[in-house]
Amino acid sequence: MKKLLFVLVASSAFLMATAQSVHFGVKAGVNIASLKVENGDDFDTKASFNAGGLAHIHVTQHFAIQPELLFSGQGGSYKVGNNTGHINLTYLNIPVLAQYMFGDGFRLETGPQVGFLLGAKSKVNKVTVDVKDSYKTSDVSWAFGAGYVSDMGLGVDIRYNLGLTNINDASNTDVQNRVFSAGLFYQFMDHHKK
């Protein structure tokens, strides 16, 4: 995990130093998250949030790298008798996305994401329990997405994060994150490149 994070950060720093241009920005959006359970019933979806910053690094006219630093609410919901329980996981995520940019502001993106668990709570009937010890402290996923940015720097994006690693630290059953997100972002731009 540390090696992967080092490679992602070092690559981003190198690209920033050699890039055609770098635009920083902020973003926020909604997550629809669930947990995939190996050989069991998957968790139902739950709504949460994501928010943070980005650096859009133009490498060529049509290719960019975009590292981000995001606070992200994840987890899932489940039935307990007639009640609904929630697993609320809070991560600090660092995606590093390769983007192909069409000339009209549209983008396709994909890349790895490393996440660090900041907190984990289980909530049923207004009773909240800390369950952070039941989950691993880090997560690796792969992101797929698309977006659009205007000449003014305001944009929208959608993304799906497919968890690749087992986050369950309490038993031998594999549990993986699944997150669909949609949001808005603003890039501080020079109005010449998208």
Predicted regions and their residues:
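Outer-membrane beta-barrel architecture
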Residues: V9, G52-L54, P95-L97, G145-G147, ...
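Residues that define the transmembrane beta-barrel architecture of outer-membrane proteins
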Residues: Q20-V22, F43-F49, N88-L92, S138-W142, ...
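Repeated loop/turn-to-beta-strand initiation elements of outer-membrane beta-barrel proteins
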Residues: V22, H62-I65, F106-L108, M152-I158, ...
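Membrane-embedded beta-strand positions of outer-membrane beta-barrel proteins
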Residues: V26-A28, P67, V96, T110, ...
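Transmembrane beta-strands of outer-membrane beta-barrel pores
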Residues: V30-S34, F49, F71-G75, V114-L118, ...
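Outer-membrane beta-barrel "beta-signal"
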Residues: N31, G147-L154, L162, Q176-K194
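Outer-membrane beta-barrel translocator domains and adjoining extracellular loop/strand segments
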Residues: K36-D42, S77-T84, A120-T128, N168-T173
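Residue-level signature of outer-membrane beta-barrel architecture
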Residues: A55-I57, Y100, F116, Y148-S150, ...
